[in-house]
Structures are given as C-alpha cells and as structure tokens.
From Swiss-Prot:
Molecular function GO terms recorded: adenyl-nucleotide exchange factor activity; protein homodimerization activity; protein-folding chaperone binding; unfolded protein binding
Lineage: Bacteria, Pseudomonadati, Pseudomonadota, Betaproteobacteria, Nitrosomonadales
Entries under PROSITE patterns matching the protein: GRPE
Presence of keyword Chaperone: yes
Organism: Nitrosospira multiformis (strain ATCC 25196 / NCIMB 11849 / C 71)
Compositional bias per record (Polar residues), positions renumbered to this chain: 14-25
Keywords recorded for this protein, A-Z: Chaperone, Cytoplasm, Stress response
Location, primary (coarse class): cytoplasm
Protein's recorded name: Protein GrpE
Gene Ontology CC, one term: cytosol
Role description: Participates actively in the response to hyperosmotic and heat shock by preventing the aggregation of stress-denatured proteins, in association with DnaK and GrpE. It is the nucleotide exchange factor for DnaK and may function as a thermosensor. Unfolded proteins bind initially to DnaJ; upon interaction with the DnaJ-bound protein, DnaK hydrolyzes its bound ATP, resulting in the formation of a stable complex. GrpE releases ADP from DnaK; ATP binding to DnaK triggers the release of the substrate protein, thus completing the reaction cycle.
GO biological process: protein folding
Subcellular location: Cytoplasm
Short name of one Pfam family: GrpE
Subunit comment: Homodimer.
Length: 193
C-alpha cells in the first residue's frame, strides 16, 4: 500500500468488489409500472385526453352561455310585454262602459229621464270597474288637508278649523295606495278675529 491508499487509524478499511459497491435488497427495490404489468400512458395519450376534456368543457361552457343569453332575452321580452300589455285587463273592462255610452248616443228619441238613467248605469259600470282594479275616489270635503292626497287651490275664510278642506273642486283618485291624481281643494284659513 502506498501512502495515499493507507487506511487512517480512525477510518474503517473499504474494499471494492467487481459488482456494484451498494447491493439492493428486495425490500429496498422500487417497482416500476412496467415491472408490475401496467403500461404507463404516453405523453401523446395524456395530451389527447386533456384536449378531449378541454373540448368537452368548452362545449359545456358555450351551451351554458347560450342558455343564459336565451333566459336573459326571454326575461327582457316578458318585461317588455308586461309594460306593453299591463292595462289590457283594465281596457277590456272599460269597453263595456264605451258600449253603453255609444248605445245612449244611438237612441234617437231619448227623453231626459232615459238619458239620465242611462248615464247613471254607465257611471255604475265605471265605478265597478274602478273598484275591481282597486282605484279609489278621493272626495275629502270636511277632512283635514293632507298634502300627499290633496292639492290646495286656495285658502278661504270659514267656520271650519284651520287646514280643513272646505270644497272639492275636482275629485282625486288613488290606485293601490298611490295617488294617481290629487283632489283639487280649497282649504280653510280658520276664523278671522
């Protein structure tokens, strides 16, 4: 042994064999898929599968997008039709009032009494139609003035308390608790001393 190959006193001596210097035992061996009979898919196969999955997902996305667009268009059409035909039922009910007025005008020898009774019946039809669609009349004579329901046209001296409706010049109307026309009224200033 030469000086370089001599073992040092604190290091064990190593020997080299013709086989590999480290021998594997059966427990330490890692098994590959080829050894177990399973064929590992090639990169081309994995790429092809990924492309098919991507195409499926893209197709599903396109269908969902188209369905969403169709729903949006249908909803928009429903809203447009609701605005366009909102008063269809009300209009249908008013046709009977129109028919009554035309029938009254068609009578050639109508007396004042016949004409008046026909107008009263027509007014009843109109009032019934209003009630059916929850249109209520505001006739607030003698009530306290409410600026949400009434429009004051003038202030007058009166025996009634201050801010009381003295006279209704034009009736108002409310649709489902929303004023569609305020009542035009004159309001009491109260007594002057």
């Amino acid at each position: 042994m030469t000086e370089e190959n001599r073992p040092q006193p604190d290091q064990p001596e190593l020997t080299v064999t013709s086989e590999s210097s480290v021998q594997e035992t059966g427990e330490n061996k890692a098994r590959t898929p080829e050894q177990e009979g399973e064929a590992m898919p090639s990169l081309e196969q994995l790429l092809k599968k990924a492309e098919l999955d991507a195409a499926e997902h893209y197709d599903a996305w396109l269908r969902a997008k188209a369905e969403g667009e169709n729903i949006r268009k249908r909803a928009q059409m429903d809203v447009t039709n609701a605005h366009k035909y909102a008063i269809e039922n009300f209009s249908t009910e008013l046709l009977s009032v129109m028919d009554s007025l035309e029938a009254a005008l068609a009578v050639e020898n109508a007396t004042v009494e016949n004409f008046k009774s026909g107008m009263e019946l027509t007014l009843k039809q109109l009032t019934a139609t209003f009630a059916k669609f929850n249109i209520k009349q505001l006739s607030p004579q003698g009530e306290k003035f409410d600026p949400h329901l009434h429009q004051a046209m003038c202030m007058v001296e009166s025996e009634l308390p201050h801010n009381t409706v003295v006279q209704v010049m034009q009736k108002g109307y409310v649709l489902n608790d929303r004023v569609i026309r305020p009542a035009l009224v004159s309001v009491s200033k109260g007594k002057e001393s």
